[in-house]
Swiss-Prot record:
Lineage of producing organism: Bacteria, Pseudomonadati, Aquificota, Aquificia, Aquificales
Pfam family, one: AAA_26
Enzyme Commission (EC) number: 6.3.3.3
Compartment list: Cytoplasm
Single Gene Ontology MF annotation: ATP binding
Name by which UniProt lists this protein: ATP-dependent dethiobiotin synthetase BioD
A GO cellular component annotation in the UniProt record: cytosol
Organism, scientific name: Aquifex aeolicus (strain VF5)
Length: 220
């Protein structure tokens, strides 16, 4: 399984979902690895990469091969920081991990149209690396438009979206009651609902359901 976990926006919980999915798969005995090709806003140690390493046991260096200090899209970070990286080297690293792990979860930065390099987005990367797509979006007001546009763009660029995760259900936002139904009607994909929690680790039943949801929708 080779999967791009992308978001409808920044801060929607991609790393949180990737961590819990990876942890559950590993606990089931699968050989699972994570890859965050580029992490920005890194001060000393990559925060997202460090969390993912706790789920899989990988080194942070293996998970995050490219890092920038500014909180920007990868391409913007290359412009602001005056340094670059080679897509070819990223591709080689991906191929190495693909051979090493049965399940490889690739976490994007921001959304699927975020540029990694000039004229090269995460949608391009998913196409070139032959990744299927899992979308993570917010549970509340505004998520219908954001989720539909992400799904539509992915489909328009020839990608296969296998699932939609709506993250952060509180029970307080009235839109949460109808958002999943409407998104399913618009995309044909039944979203998986994840509650808002204070901890980084989902309750076991929710985590199990998350992994079952993804595995049931994935056809090699």
């Amino acid at each position: 399984m080779r999967l791009l976990i992308t978001g409808t926006d920044t801060g929607v919980g991609k790393t949180f979902i990737t961590y819990n999915l990876a942890k559950e798969l590993k606990e089931r005995g699968y050989k699972v690895g994570c890859l965050k090709p580029v992490e920005t806003y890194v001060r000393e140690v990559p925060e997202d990469g460090s969390l993912l390493s706790k789920a899989t046991g990988q080194s942070v260096n293996e998970i995050v091969p490219v890092r920038f200090s500014l909180p920007l899209a990868p391409y913007a970070a290359t412009l602001e920081e005056g340094r670059d990286f080679a897509l070819e080297e990223l591709g080689k690293h991906y191929e190495e991990l693909s051979k090493k792990y049965k399940f490889l979860l690739v976490e994007g930065a921001g959304g699927i149209a975020v540029p990694i390099k000039k004229n090269y987005t995460y949608a391009n990367l998913a196409r070139d690396w032959k990744l299927k797509v899992l979308i993570v979006g917010r549970a509340g007001l505004g998520t219908i438009n954001h989720t539909f546009l992400t799904w539509y763009y992915a489909k328009a660029t020839g990608l296969e979206v296998i699932g939609i995760i709506l993250n952060g259900f509180t029970g307080e936002d009235v839109s949460e009651r109808t958002n999943p139904q409407i998104i399913e009607e618009m995309t044909g994909i039944k979203p998986y609902k994840v509650p808002r929690i204070q901890d980084v680790e989902l309750p076991k039943d929710i985590r199990t359901g998350l992994a079952d949801y993804v595995l049931s929708r994935f056809t090699p």
